[in-house]
Amino acid sequence: MLPRRLLLVGEGNFSFAASLIDGLDPSVSVTATGFQHRAALEGDPVALENLKRLRERGVEVRFGVDCTQLSHALPADDRDFDRIYFNFPHCGRKAGVAKNRELLAKFFQSCADVLAKAGEVHVTLCRGQGGTPADKPQREWHNSWQVVAMAALGGFILSDVCPFSCEAVPGYKCTGYRSQDRPFHIEGALTYIFTQSLPFESCQPRTFRVRLEDRWFYFTEPEALPGKLNRRFLEASSCHPIRTINEKLIAELGKTFPLKRLKCPLPLLSRGGPSVFLPATCDLLPTFWIRLHEDNSCSEFQNGEITQEMEEIPVSVSECTLPESPVRDGCKGAQEGICGRVKLGLRPSLLVHVEAVIHSPDFLPASLHVLSGPVFRKCHILPFMMPAFHETLFILGFDNNMKESCLPSLLGHLKDALGNLLTQTLQEGSSLGTSVEFVLQPNGKDYIIHVKSLNFGPDCAENLIIGSILTSKIVKHKHQCFVFVSINLDLLVMLAYGISDWRILWTFDNRFLKRFAPGKIEHFKSYSLYPPCYVHDVSFWVDEKKAFDELEFHTVARAVSQDTVVSVQYRDRFQHPETRQVSLCYRLTYQTCDKALTPQLAAAMQSQFRKEIQRQLHVSPR
């Protein structure tokens, strides 16, 4: 949508405003402001001529406007601008980078008061001042104006960068270099375009309700999975790229095999329900466990009065059952006893459902059964490791004597389907590419699906594991063999669309989905560029009586930071020469992919992290 209301700040001789209006539709409203008062421009014929042109076009001109206090200069009914321009900001004279950073920070904070919700802030800086990779050459961070970090203080993210073009505004003469009537060096200048970020929500986790037998319970979302439960990306009404890639993959395999799509069970498992052991390895996956609390407001919910912070997840009796209780009269002690014994886990893999699927009376041999849904597992903080993702499981059963023909056919078509999906966004003649490889495992029967992609740059040219193919007899059956193909859809989407950060798939920002055409695979262009990162170290003494759990250390970091920690690096180990006590040191890097993260907020998260590891992991900060 074209901007209808423009605000120009920091106008010196008003030549930018006078040039800009020539190319605008007459319906566009323009307000041009300058820091100087009207009297200071009397001796400048260029400025006077520009002011005359602006008056003739009906442009509102304001003098003596401080761009760091825009809400004071503009009345409440004259705000909500669609676009704010600030060209070549400068504190004046020989002000250093620190002063100019302060100017930018206060300017962005001021913009938040007068900008429309979907508005943009355009800031043009001289070559190198911004401190971003868009600058050629790029200045050292400490010697730049750190424009993206300063914008974050006002709640803004960098959404685009483009070269500043004088040809687009003929007649523009930038002045004010060192508070003199001298132009800035505009060769290589860049215009940075900022948009408002979604705010960081409070750390209060969401609450969900479940029904077991004839009783209602509630549980809170694990803090390490903020905004990950009940997102419904795979439903028919969704236009999320995860659904798009899943539908295309299923359709490709459906050209060769009869399909039977199954309704995915809910991701809640009880200790007495399906096993959380992966049949292939019998390794217990790191599972998120949740405790139920009895909901005593049943009557309110039965009347339809469901509070907004509660989300309802119905669970069938067959999936989770309550332990027998001799007391059902509402006794508090009995209720607490039952709740203490009811412990649910979030499904770590769809493979936990294979027994139920193949033993179902309507299971059809030679048909490809498809199960798709979210899974959750604790993991270390690494670029391509995710605690929540969407998985598609293909299950194919066939007679023992058909294995030699069915298995190669499935593997061949699967490889072709994956290859087609991963090459749709490549430009013709591109040297970058993606290769799919099935790597045979030591047992000689199972495979790991490797994808080597150069689309993320040389640093990410590793083999990514996007799934597995299990052909060993993980399920006992007299006359049939089974193949189970598990695909990580989130990783597949990242590779197909060129998305470098998995966290953006879970954003609540509507701009993400607007980047995609329904049903199409196109290269993703991020709306948050060059987000700043903040590094903090933490050192602590470990408890000699308890083994240090590094996985829980990562999980606490994920929970406290709301998934803003992108790296946890082990730095050092120290043993006190006298007490023999052991100390560990780790380095945490904070960075967001869709929100404005300030250094103050990152420091506050780090402070809270120190407290939480002391409380949960029983370590002593140094």
UniProtKB/Swiss-Prot annotation:
Cross-referenced InterPro entries: BMT5-like, Fdx_antiC-bd, Fdx_antiC-bd_sf, SAM-dependent_MTases_sf
SMART domains: FDX-ACB
Highest taxon of source: Eukaryota
GO biological process: rRNA base methylation
Protein name: Ferredoxin-fold anticodon-binding domain-containing protein 1 homolog
Paired cysteines (S-S): none
Domain FDX-ACB: 529-622
Organism listed in the record: Mus musculus (Mouse)
Pfam families linked to this entry: BMT5-like, FDX-ACB
UniProt-listed Gene3D superfamilies: Ferrodoxin-fold anticodon-binding domain, Vaccinia Virus protein VP39
One MF term in the entry's GO annotations: rRNA (uridine-N3-)-methyltransferase activity
Name of the gene this protein is made from: Fdxacb1
PANTHER family: FERREDOXIN-FOLD ANTICODON-BINDING DOMAIN-CONTAINING PROTEIN 1, PHENYLALANYL-TRNA SYNTHETASE
